[in-house]
Structure formats: structure tokens, C-alpha cells
């Protein structure tokens, strides 16, 4: 009986020794990979780190993980103005991509549901965006002025294709969606924010 137990123990040890890398080992590998990149290459090419940096602004985004044919991470809503308003202005975040290794699209959305505090919300939204981009040494060079004026705009920001879309939600209130695209991104679907208000395919 003892020899059988000993044999079983050896089998278990062998099985444990043959297991794949641990979570900590994967995180260390991701961090090492991220350290070799900079700018947008790092923002799109290091999903785990990017989600962590987004979460510094309170979005509490989920892990970047498989969701049907794509990979998604979703965060928010976060309150961007008077929290005790009947319907505070809020922001949400999504990252989408075709593979686990890279993000193809970063989407930040501001829903203006409290007109009385809309200017404050837009200002804070811009601060969040600039704070996020500053971690990668990226400057919008005034491009986010379209947010405060509630004007749709398209053009590169730091070399990456970007768009600011101002649409109306089901209740007629403004929704400002800022999208940053990886130049070679191939995500086959748009994140949910655009679909929710019926303004995207």
C-alpha cells in the first residue's frame, strides 16, 4: 500500500511540474514585452497593461478576453460631473480586437445626460483622455477641442487614426464617442457604445 501511495505522489509531482506558466509568470512576460514598446505601439500591443492604465481613471474595466469572434474589455460607467444630479453625466470605455495579443480599437464615450453640468463633464472627459495618452507620451495637440465644442471630427492623434463622433441617444441627449484605431486593426465589429444608440452598423 505504501509503495502505491508513493507512486501516486510521484505521479502528482510530475503532473505539477509539467504545468504551464503561472499567472505571475505571464504577467512578467507581458510587462517585459510592453517595456520594449512605446507610444501607440505600446497602447495597442500590451492589452493587460493598457487596461490597467485605463483603470487608473476609475473605469474598472474587465480583462481583455474572448467575446464571440473578437476580444473585448469593458469599463464604466464613471461619473464625470455632479454625482447627486438626477442623471449624472457618465463615461464608459471599451477595447476591442481580433486577437488576444493586440487591441485594434480603444473607445471612450461620454453620455451627456445632465445638461446643467455638461461643461464640467466635457472638461473632465478631456482630462481623462489626456491623462491616459500622457502615459504613452502622446499629445492630442488641441484635437480634443472638438469635444468641448461638441463637433464631430476625424484625424490622426499622435499618428494613430482617431475620430470624435457626436450623436444623439434614444432620449435625444448628446453622446460623444472618441475612438482610437490601430492603423492595421481588423476588428470585425464595433464596440457596444455605438451600437447602443443605433448610430453604428
Tell where the protein language model's regions lie, with residue ranges.
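Sec-dependent bacterial lipoprotein signal peptides
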Residues: 1-14
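Short, surface-exposed beta-strand/loop "edge" segments at domain boundaries and coil↔beta transitions
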Residues: 79-81, 86-90, 114-119, 182-193
